[in-house]
Amino acid sequence: MSRVSQARNLGKYFLLIDNMLVVLGFFVVFPLISIRFVDQMGWAAVMVGIALGLRQFIQQGLGIFGGAIADRFGAKPMIVTGMLMRAAGFATMGIAHEPWLLWFSCFLSGLGGTLFDPPRSALVVKLIRPEQRGRFFSLLMMQDSAGAVIGALLGSWLLQYDFRLVCATGAILFILCALFNAWLLPAWKLSTARTPVREGMRRVMSNKRFVTYVLTLAGYYMLAVQVMLMLPIMVNDIAGSPAAVKWMYAIEACLSLTLLYPIARWSEKRFRLEHRLMAGLLVMSLSMLPIGMVGNLQQLFTLICAFYIGSVIAEPARETLSASPADARARGSYMGFSRLGLAIGGAISYIGGGWLFDMGKALAQPELPWMMLGIIGFITFLALGWQFSHKRTPRRMLEPGA
């Protein structure tokens, strides 16, 4: 085995271990924020939506800057610094009793993510061969789902005692992750050249097809991020207990672990990537529409199952499409910019969704936010269809098995 192949194989295992620590640290805390501050402390959902939207926008919206800096200085210092900054954000969240302090903690958490997320994604592009990326992204997503349910279970258990324990656990996990990277991550360059920050950003912005695709995905993310805000609140409202939220993540884990990799393997040989993305988005949109009209957990969990199945179909294709055009001279910049749709869609959906949720309750129309999300999903579906049919996408982005 050549040294390059050996480095790639070792890199895969490193990425998987690192990803598990990050996912556990995140999901111990974030799914419970809405339960803690809306249900336990009585805050308006829009206040928590602003906090979650701020974290999303800072982390993903500034990702191109974090990626460009990592292209210039390498992955390791950015990742370690970002992990420690997120740990500080979680520690601050544990003592938040006013909205401004929650917002500040989410700002710190998002800024940390800005530093570590783009270089971690760029390492995947660097270490995983193009023909293997779809399957590797599926493995990462299976791991995400398992880590999400384990993290949510642990966080729900700790929440019975004290929210500060929840935040302390998340902070400790990110400190461990920082130490893991500081100890074992080689000083790898992300790009084939030490690209200046401005040059990396220029290369991304000149790729109009990629920019259009990323911005169109904002509508997709408006649906996807509600697993952190309105879905947990809805489950808690119907069940009458925050303990039921863990079953929502258990459903996601079961579906992902049993279906994600087989569906990815089966569909990559039969359908183009853009068809898989659009099919998954359509299922997600259809499942969102009736959520506000359900009256029991069985109906709600059935719709959540359908939503997760749509995500299982769409996510590997979306990740592969986002990684395919990355210029080897500016990998960090490309992967940072690829998160901009999540920044825009997530921020709008968290703040707007929280506001619509409060308004729906006030007007006795709980279906209002869910109908709006379903409509946004359909508009995004049509926009992606127009883009893929009118703007010729490179064959390597579309071919089965690309």
UniProtKB/Swiss-Prot annotation:
Gene Ontology terms, MF aspect: transmembrane transporter activity
Pfam families in UniProt: MFS_1
Side Cytoplasmic, residues: 1-12, 117-138, 186-213, 265-276, 321-339, 389-402
Chief site of localization: membrane
Signal peptide positions on this chain: none
Keywords recorded for this protein, A-Z: Cell inner membrane, Cell membrane, Membrane, Transmembrane, Transmembrane helix, Transport
Localization (cell): Cell inner membrane
Cellular component, GO, one term: plasma membrane
Periplasmic side: 34-98, 160-164, 235-243, 298-299, 361-367
TM segment ranges: 13-33, 99-116, 139-159, 165-185, 214-234, 244-264, 277-297, 300-320, 340-360, 368-388
Bilayer topology term: Multi-pass membrane protein
HAMAP family in alphabetical order: MFS_MdtH
NCBIfam families for the chain: PRK11646.1 (NF008650)
Similarity remark: Belongs to the major facilitator superfamily. DHA1 family. MdtH (TC 2.A.1.2.21) subfamily.
Protein's name according to its UniProt entry: Multidrug resistance protein MdtH
Gene responsible for this protein: mdtH
